[in-house]
Amino acid sequence: MNITILTNRDLASCFALNRLIPGLAEHQVTVFLSSRVGSKPLALPLQHLKFVEQDLLNGLIAPLLDSGALGRARVGQALFSFEQLAERVIGGVSTLNAINDAAGYERYVESKPDLVLSVRYGVILRDPAMSLPKHGVLNLHSGLLPD
């Protein structure tokens, strides 16, 4: 089955992918990442949260994980960066912030999703993106969704 995972480039999503991907080894998996949630400027408390959830992982931790032997996992390493996870999925891991625009939607269509798992994805899917996968979209989100 072709499974497309839509997720955010943050700590919780990286952890979720580390748990999901091994269980999906029998499937064709493509992962698209959003760079952030929402498009409005962040209030100061949310900027601090962004540092903990995104900047710390992507700017400090992941480069250290990826620096050894071309990013290959170290012996005994249990959690992997987005870049290391990309080596474990056939469809790759890439950024897709504009899934509802023509070019972004075309990239999404190319993943030929039978099922979409949306885990903390930072973009609200419009009807064409929602109706594309024949088995639907399963949305896993850690908080209330906007109206």
Stretch-by-stretch model annotation:
Residues 1-147:
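One-carbon transfer enzymes
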